[in-house]
Design a protein with these regions (language model features):
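Short A/G/S/P-biased low-complexity tracts
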Residues: 23, 338-341
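A short, hydrophobic C-terminal helix/tail in secreted or cell-surface proteins
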Residues: 319-339
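Short, charged juxtamembrane terminal tails flanking transmembrane helices
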Residues: 342-346
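Bacterial N-terminal signal peptides that target proteins for export
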Residues: 1-8
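Bacterial N-terminal signal peptides
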Residues: 9-16
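Sec/Tat signal peptide C-region and signal peptidase I cleavage site
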Residues: 17-23
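Sequence/structural signature of beta-propeller domains
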Residues: 24-316
Length: 346
């Protein structure tokens, strides 16, 4: 959602605030605003996803997606325009090559409609993939661990959370009852929650919630300021030394920002939640008896979608929802999740 005035974080249920014990992440521009504008006619960045040999992003109220190379250059239009994407924020994700989904095909949906579109990885073809969801699409992720059948997970602005299989058939997992934009899966046990559990960041509830495979939901942390995306820091982040590793996020309404892998190594296994209201970058961790939250920001600009990229997603065709680093058969393929923006700037 587009937001301008910071909303103060008030209370955290089941959690406590703490002063960061490490240096805050340092962000720098990865894809410039002018290069995006030259390709698609605007640079109010919203979605951004890693797709194996490229990144694919979206712009607010813009029908055309764009792609970049792995260095943030070579910005070009991706696929053909989709009229439905004119309705506001468009969320972008990439499939993992499991559960019947192809490796790193691109999927996108807009906040104005309950439809998801599929694009071939090279952008040469595209089609409507799933439709009829209640509420506009706010987030798309792929279950890398299997607790949710390796299906696509979609969140909508009505708070509905859907499982969507590889044929595009959707079934309701649960509803949190409010706008939800961030999705991610825990790469290991997180507090009392099992490895592979789905976590969602809800703007409407100002909370981080956990959702079991059976659809039971519980609040993990509340009182967050306009939580936008949630992503677990990959367990092997920075292990390869490859410069592509790191954290990437859309900085509305300007560009794409990146923080190097080393900046997030102190937070491996933690949940990172960005706040849309005032540049917050929340670190949420389990201290053995309770969840503890620290603000390790600021993020430059208004945070939109974001992703962690690690060696496993660079070298192997199996990444994860907006994060792409999970631990599957000894392979790290965690995942992050992010989200989209709202209709009228507020």
């Amino acid at each position: 959602m587009r937001f301008h005035l910071p909303v103060p974080a008030v209370a955290l249920s089941l959690a406590a605030w703490a002063v960061p014990a490490h240096a805050n992440p340092t962000f720098s521009t990865f894809v410039t605003g002018p290069s995006i504008a030259a390709a698609v006619g605007g640079n109010s960045t919203i979605g951004f996803a890693y797709a194996g040999n490229k990144f694919v992003g979206s712009v607010y109220f813009n029908t055309q997606l764009y792609s970049t190379n792995l260095s943030g250059g070579g910005v070009a239009a991706f696929g053909a325009p989709v009229a439905a994407f004119a309705g506001g924020e468009t969320y972008v994700s990439s499939s993992l090559g499991i559960g019947g989904f192809g490796p790193r095909d691109v999927y996108a949906g807009n906040q104005s409609l309950g439809n998801v579109y599929r694009f071939a990885n090279d952008g040469s073809s595209q089609s409507l993939f799933a439709s009829g969801l209640s509420g506009g699409v706010r987030s798309i992720a792929f279950d890398p661990y299997g607790l949710y059948g390796n299906n696509m997970i979609v969140a909508t602005n009505t708070g509905n959370i859907y499982k969507v299989d590889s044929s595009g058939v959707a079934s309701l997992l649960t509803s949190v009852g409010a706008d939800t934009e961030g999705l991610s899966f825990a790469p290991q046990a997180f507090g009392t929650y099992a490895a592979g559990t789905l976590f969602v960041a809800s703007e409407g509830l100002s909370s981080l919630l956990a959702i079991t495979p059976g659809g039971l939901k519980s609040t993990v942390v509340s009182g967050l300021s306009v939580p936008e995306m949630v992503s677990f820091v990959p367990l092997n982040l920075g292990s390869s030394g490859n410069p592509v590793e790191g954290f990437y996020a859309a900085s509305y309404p300007n560009n794409i920002q990146k923080a190097g892998a080393s900046d997030f190594v102190p937070y491996i296994g933690h949940a990172i939640v960005t706040g849309e209201g005032g540049g917050q970058v929340y670190d949420i961790r389990w201290n053995g008896s309770a969840f503890v939250t620290s603000d390790i920001g600021p993020f430059p600009g208004q945070a939109e979608d974001g992703i962690f990229v690690t060696a496993d997603i660079i070298q192997n065709p199996v990444p994860e929802p907006e994060t792409y680093a999970l631990m599957m058969a000894g392979l790290g393929v965690l995942g992050f999740i992010a989200r989209r923006k709202r209709q009228t700037p507020r």
